[in-house]
């Protein structure tokens, strides 16, 4: 029997692989059940035989089962040799198994359970004699060390699949562990032959009670895989959210959720290639969609997916781009850094900016992350007060100072109406109690469309001037460098400290407009001129600072000033006893500190400065009226100011401050004529005068008067840095030099001059101020229209006087013109007009100048030629002006003409009368079409009144 048993064993050794397949198969249960019945019948027939015979019957049953399985498999593949390869390849499918669809795993698990119930228990108890087959299967499970289970499960999954495709998928080995499993299986099979029958029976019985798909959890599989030396791979299906095995899954589930974030993101194609590809699609967008999409299996919120704290070894230092975009749903479980300060690409800034632009600064997206401003340019929307981005705006939200904004502030959009500066400044209303006056600045580009610019806005320069006027002493003449507003009283000589009469510059026109006049750019021969920002504070006690002292010269950085051709400018040559002041400016403008020294107890003499000639172009801007602390911002041309108490005898007492400041005082060889604009033509108020109205605030105190000549008052709102200039007595009164200078100036100012005017028509001076001239009994005045550049010894005419009690608007004129004396260009400053009521303006407009003196003596032939050219140009300009007036009068007469209330002759008469009246009154004819349009726009009301007056006069006669 032993020989037969060995023979039978050696006989079935060649068919060993079918034994393994027979025990592992899942879907061959009907065939196995038939074989079980047949085996049971054989077992009942041979029940009285020996145990060896029983073993033989068990082998017969095994042979039947093997033959049945072999025949079944042979129908598909044809030979048992292929079955051996297929069985070997099943061990190699451990890595393919986890990536299969979930539809293959559910039947697998159910098939395994049926296999455990039917096959294992039935065979374990019905075939007690078949211990060899059981021992072989037990040996396979024991020597698998975790991999035998894979063999059984993998084979079962292939059998559960339909057709030979499942076998074909398992043909190609993907892992080098196949040969290792095959060698271990062969050694285990050889060892199983030498084991005893009882041991095999007991082992098979014990194994049958605990099938390989027990509910012992996944820990034992992890331990077995680690003990066998294999890596503990995470469950990919659990990471993808579709693992249905739960605790029975052989792969670990802990921290598997973090595996999907281990891969580094690819380089953004937008950052790599720019925006060249229109069909750009960010691969991270697809990852975000897959990452944030809930899985179909419903395991998104199960178990370890909602872990509150991820493992620290999976933490990455890379920023979470989902959090930057504002859509990271992982919260604290995200392994990437949730930090707003981490650097990121520029396209994320675009996403953020676009989102902020759509939703506004108060949205949750805008508040979630803090935007970093890397751009140093100011935000123009913030200057207008309408930036919707708020703190997320990449541009600076700090209002730039006017020096940074440049000189063309009126032309820059958004400069007015914006928020005030953030500095700790005092408001004008608290410091000065001044009346807020709005003004219009007319530049070359927007003369027809004036930009309203409030003078009451908080400007750092003006506020600092007001604040420094209190600190620097109340009785002194000071010059504040425009770059030294932060330091008070630096390089400013204090003359005395006491209460002072406060002078108020009148700054407003009848039409609330400030005209920036023409500046001619001339080539100069000598050094740069000096322009000072004169802050006038007159006190009782003052030190006697003689002319010629350098008072706080401070050279500052020099800014180029753009030349502006704006409102028309008219020459006003006021030459007192053949003395003129040259007020030169170079492209390098400097600022100087001036101080007035007392001449005697009741008088102040303005020390003069020796200056060099240059060719500037300068822009003037409005200066707010300072009514509280008498801190006046002027730009005083660093002029050659002679002591007029000696040369001209012009003395201004305290109660009698000069109305008409002489605009020209000559020093040395430099003679010039000042270019005074015609406010009547530019703003429609012909009666506005170019005079400075000083109103003393404390007239009862013992004060001193000053001798002022050649003081040019210019608005100091431009960002011009100026340096100091020495003050010295250099007065020259030469009749010959005056004639030569006036002749040479004609060639530059022919378009803006008229040959038939030589006197000065005075405006309404302040009764509190009078000009005492030793050489002429009449006080000086400035004519609003043309005034002659040929005047050599000025006899000035008095004019209407308006009491200061009338709250009339005031004008601030900023005209400039450049002249030349022997090739030396000169900057001619302006004066400021007083407040004049509308009635006085209308009267002064229609009233011709009285007692006008002419100085026609000019021996230069060059002047005569220039006069002829001037007349020809004036005739063309006058013709254009008359045509414009005629059109205007015709439009005004249309309603009356259509109603038939006047005849054709009356219509023509009215048109002719109005045109003649205006042209004879307005001697300074506008030269260009733009200037004519400006005049017509500002003079519309007055012209209408004049037309209606003639209509009432001539229509009644008909």
Swiss-Prot record:
PANTHER family to which the protein is assigned, alphabetical: PROTEIN FRIGIDA-ESSENTIAL 1, ZINC FINGER CCCH DOMAIN-CONTAINING PROTEIN 38
PROSITE patterns with a match to the protein in the record: ZF_C3H1
The entry's keywords: DNA-binding, Metal-binding, Repeat, Zinc, Zinc-finger
Database matches in SUPFAM superfamilies: CCCH zinc finger (SSF90229)
Compositionally biased region (Low complexity): 152-163, 832-843
Stated name of the protein: Zinc finger CCCH domain-containing protein 55
Biased composition (Basic and acidic residues): 1-16, 33-47, 80-126, 216-226, 273-291, 298-311, 346-355, 458-471, 850-860
GO MF entries: DNA binding; zinc ion binding
Disordered as annotated region, ranges: 1-235, 273-311, 346-378, 403-491, 670-707, 756-781, 799-873
